[in-house]
Design a protein with these regions (language model features):
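Predominant activation on well-ordered alpha-helical scaffold segments within soluble catalytic domains
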Residues: 25, 71, 127, 176, ...
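Hydrophobic alpha-helix position signal
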Residues: 27, 33, 73, 130, ...
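Pocket-lining segment of extracytoplasmic ligand-binding domains
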Residues: 155-254
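Conserved C-terminal helix/tail region of periplasmic/extracytoplasmic solute-binding proteins
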Residues: 292-340
Length: 340
């Protein structure tokens, strides 16, 4: 049994427990955090913005949000630092229904764009992406939050189907959720952002990372194991999550099989971006200076941030060796033996 490392509070950037971010909860549910000597609490913050502000205010130790939040936080003097690359590819895009005639960002002029997660920082990212494509986000488009919560697939699908919005600024998992509702989406090419990596990261305050490195290293290692488990057996990951968190399962009156297919589809979309194979540094949690520099150049060029800094300020790789200090074979064997 590992020595006790104490408590760690994770502020979840979602309205409720969800398979979209299954490894965060599975790190605890599968016993990986306990084996590290960590007493982990995952508190629902409700939104990415609330999670970030909670960590900055000291109400939690870390959250998992898009790396854009860190750049914008530094720009206002809050040293909120990514230390583990959770999603290795770009996970934000503009999408349209598969049957839509819209094929480019330029064709969004005059359209209403639905917002999947309506946070100021994510709006800033959307505006920057449009500016990069030559679209004026203030004059050429209208933004409108999608109906319900960002996890309420039926309500969001109804709004898109009705034509109330022509496109969506979405998190990758929305594609899986909508596919589960019979509404396949197609991402629009966005050369200015498609190559920017990583996207979602584990992020904490600089001083906390310096004061408790063993704690953050242990949690990152547990998340790496849970991610590998989910990659190996996504269906088992959803089942484990539902067993430990019934509120993540079917809504009252909802067909369980339909809900399972939808949640599995969303998780599989997310997991495709969490693979480390092909990443600039193919180790769990790693971020490179070149990646951080590319993000900074994009955000500066589109006016999203005002100040240039050494790229290394925007991330920490100090714990990457610790994240990867485990036997992947043991995790894979467990996942494989956990049923179809």
């Amino acid at each position: 049994m590992a020595a006790s490392l104490g408590r760690l509070t994770v502020l979840a950037s979602v309205p409720h427990v969800t398979a979209n971010f299954a490894p965060i909860w599975l790190a605890k549910d599968l016993g990986y955090t306990a084996a590290e000597g960590l007493d982990v609490t995952v508190e629902i913050a409700g939104s990415p913005k609330d999670a970030v502000e909670g960590v900055i205010a000291g109400r939690g130790d870390l959250s998992f949000v898009n790396i854009v939040f860190s750049f914008l936080a530094y720009d206002r003097g809050a040293p909120y630092r990514p230390f583990y690359a959770f999603v290795r590819r770009q996970n934000r895009s503009f999408s349209v229904p598969e049957t839509s005639p819209i094929r480019s960002l330029g064709e969004l002029r005059g359209k209403v764009i639905g917002l999947h997660y309506d946070d100021p920082e994510l709006r800033a990212f959307a505006r920057a992406a449009l500016v990069g494509a030559g679209v004026d986000p203030e004059r050429d488009v209208v933004f409108k939050p999608l109906a319900g919560s960002p996890l309420d697939a039926p309500k969001m699908a109804a709004m898109i189907r009705s034509g109330e919005v022509a496109a969506v600024w979405q998190l990758d998992v929305l594609s899986g959720l909508m596919a589960g509702e019979g509404l396949p989406l197609r991402s629009l090419p966005a050369p200015e952002i498609d190559g920017l990596t990583p996207s979602s990261c584990l992020e904490a305050m600089e001083d906390a990372l310096a004061e408790r490195p063993a704690v953050f290293a242990a949690f990152g290692r547990a998340v790496a194991k849970a991610t590998l488990f989910a990659l190996t057996n996504p269906a088992a990951a959803v089942r484990f999550l539902w067993q430990h968190h019934p509120d993540a399962g079917p809504a009252p009156g909802e067909d369980p099989a339909h809900a399972f297919r939808r949640e599995l589809a969303a998780l599989e979309v997310r997991l495709a971006s969490q693979r480390i194979e092909g990443a600039p540094d193919p180790r769990w949690g790693a971020i490179t200076e070149r990646e951080a520099a590319a993000w900074q150049e994009f955000l500066l060029s589109t006016g999203a941030i005002a100040s240039r800094r050494p790229p290394a300020i925007y991330y920490s790789n100090a714990l990457v060796d610790a994240f990867n200090a485990f036997d992947p074979g043991e995790v894979i064997d467990r996942a494989t033996s956990s049923g179809p």
